[in-house]
Amino acid sequence: MIPSATYRIQFRNGMTFDRAAALAPYLKDLGISHLYASPIFTATSGSTHGYDITDPNEIDPAIGGREGFDRMVKALRNAQIGLILDIVPNHMATSLENRWWRDVIEQGKNSAWAHYFDIDWTRPVTLPFLGDTFEIGRASCRERV
C-alpha cells in the first residue's frame, strides 16, 4: 500500500510501543494510512531521539522491546495502518555502550567490527571527548594555556 497520509511518532521521552498502539484507532479515524516511526533500535542510555544506535540487532527495551513492537504492529494491522521504520543504518553511536565501537577502540584495526566504521588507520585515532559541557571545557582549556 502506498502511503497517503503519514503520522510520525518520536519514540522515547515517554512514547513507547504500547502508547503508539493505543493511538491506532484514533489515527484510523483521522484517515492516517501509515505510522512513520523514529528509530527503534537500542540507542545510548537516555537517548531522546534514537539516532545514536548502540545495537542494530535489538529493538530498544526502553521503548518496549520486541514484545512491545509486536503488540504495536498488531494494533496497527487491526486498524489497517501500515508502518514505516526509520532504520538509520548510518547512525551508530561512538559510545562505549556500543559493543562494536568499544571493540574497535580496544582492538584497533584488528577488530572484527573495524570495517563498519570509516577510520583512517594510517594515523592514530583521535577521540576528542569533553568531560563536561562545551562551555566549561573551553573555559578549562583557556585556564591551562
Residue ranges and their predicted role:
Residues M1-R144:
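Catalytic cores of glycan-processing enzymes that make or break glycosidic bonds
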